[in-house]
């Protein structure tokens, strides 16, 4: 069992790094590659509109 544990830990750490760090890297790199104005418009469309829809659904 002791010989099996080190590879499992390595695989787990690699899976955690690829699954957790790469999305964060993309979230920082992708907006930086795009123009600032497009980022602002996309953020408003993605975040502000859904919130208004959620509020309307809750009120009904």
Curated annotation (Swiss-Prot):
First-listed, main subcellular location of the protein, grouped into a coarse class: host cell
Localization annotation: Host membrane
GO annotations of cellular component type: host cell membrane; membrane
TM segment ranges: 11-33
Membrane topology of this protein: Single-pass membrane protein
Glycosylation sites (chain numbering): 40, 57
Keywords from the UniProt entry: Early protein, Glycoprotein, Host membrane, Membrane, Transmembrane, Transmembrane helix
Superkingdom classification of source: Viruses
Upregulating conditions: Expressed in the early phase of the viral replicative cycle.
Entry protein name: Uncharacterized protein DP60R
Organism expressing this protein natively: African swine fever virus (strain Badajoz 1971 Vero-adapted)
High-level lineage: Viruses, Varidnaviria, Bamfordvirae, Nucleocytoviricota, Pokkesviricetes
């Amino acid at each position: 069992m002791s010989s099996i544990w080190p590879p499992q830990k390595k695989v787990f750490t690699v899976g955690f790094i690829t699954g957790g760090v790469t999305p964060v890297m993309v979230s920082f790199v992708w907006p930086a590659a795009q123009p600032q104005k497009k980022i602002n418009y996309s953020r408003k469309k993605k975040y502000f509109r859904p919130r208004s829809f959620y509020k309307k659904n809750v009120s009904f």
